[in-house]
Amino acid sequence: MRRRTALLVASATAVALALGGLLGGVLAEAPSAGPRPAVESRALAQRALSPAGGSLTGTAVGALEAAVRARPRDADTLVELGFAYQLRWRETGDASYLPLSETALDRALHVRPDDANAVLGLGSLALIRHEFRSALVYGRHARRLLVGSARPYGVIGDALVELGRYPAAFAAFERMVSLRPSLASYARIAYARELTGDREGAEGAMRLALEAAGGQPESTAWALVEISKLDLSLGRVDRAERLAREAGQALPGYPSARIQLARVEAARGDDQAAIRDAREAVAALPTQQGVALLADLLDRAGRPSAARNQRRLVGVIEQLLQASGVRVDLEAAGYRADRHIEPSKTVELARRARADRPSIYGDDALGWALARAGRCAEALPWARRSLRLGTKDPLLYFHLGYAEGCAGNRAAMRDWYARALELSPQFSVRWAPVARTALGCS
């Protein structure tokens, strides 16, 4: 999973920090059987969502739902419930929580039309659903309501990044960190540096984010995983493994740490361990990226039937996300292009994705789909455009190399394949072996 996906997930929930520490909250006290008065139910939910470690549970959501039933026009509780549903989605992968979040936040705005936290909640929901133009509108509205606050700039900057408006996005991130240095703001600075090719600077900013986590378990684990991803992308396998294991120790059972450990083990060639850890991760949190990794690992291990089962699950997850309003064209186009599924339809899917997300990764998705469809001359400009920021992403390098080879430029193909492997020798379970074979490497 590319880091931008993880950052969008984090972005979609980080704004909840101002609402009682929703990010990474825990169930501090389980309710006894029977109904509770509204005030007591809400107090329980607030304790359940406090930043004391662990993760949000369905019981906390239930407590907020009880409070809303007792006081249906309590805008504050409706907003907290809206964010809680988003966090529940993040923890479980169950996209049916997203329409519930929208309903709760819309109800809060009906009660209190200029509730800035409700507007931010809808902005974070739009990011989750990949509705980036809507997210930008909500972020700017929240900025007008919260003059001098850092929080709206996260939503604004994240939306601008996905819309390919990089100077404005990076300015938003700089403004955010100047207003409030925090895990959320440092993580965005790190991503901006990564996009512009400054991977060492990105790691430095992520270490500031780790310090800002202050030992809070989920925030610490998340930051450790992101630093591990950076190290793995730079070929620092030992450091990446150590950090992934530290993340699992900081928050036992954390699926993101487990899937990152699977990536590291795959890079080492330890497919048995990678399959084991990927299975555990997707059993806890079945994401498209995690399941696709497991399918690729099973294929590499010579277990095609098991791999097919996982690929079917990817399709089911995609359908469930779409049913809950999440736009998955970009991710679906990349997945299908990788596997050469209906190339012409994949090109059209990639065109829609790029129209929605005219970023370097939108460019890459369209170029990759065109190259895999054999439309080489059309693919090259998009593949080249994907590197316009100087991003050091081995998969972007590989995709450009493939497009060059498709167009008959064999020397350029070999050059880009070599760059990809030099940057990260095991950059992809599926494509690193292809690059090595093309270069005559063992």
Pin down the residues of each PLM region.
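N-terminal leader/linker segments that initiate helical-solenoid repeat arrays
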Residues: 2-111, 116-117, 137, 425-426, ...
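TPR-repeat structural position
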Residues: 57, 91, 98, 132, ...
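Short coil turns that delineate tetratricopeptide repeat
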Residues: 72, 113, 147, 180-181, ...
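Start-of-helix register in tetratricopeptide repeats
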Residues: 76, 83, 117, 151, ...
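Canonical tetratricopeptide repeat
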Residues: 80, 121, 155, 188-189, ...
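Residue-level recognition of tetratricopeptide repeat
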Residues: 83, 87-90, 124, 158, ...
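Register position in tetratricopeptide repeats
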Residues: 87, 128-129, 162-163, 195-196, ...
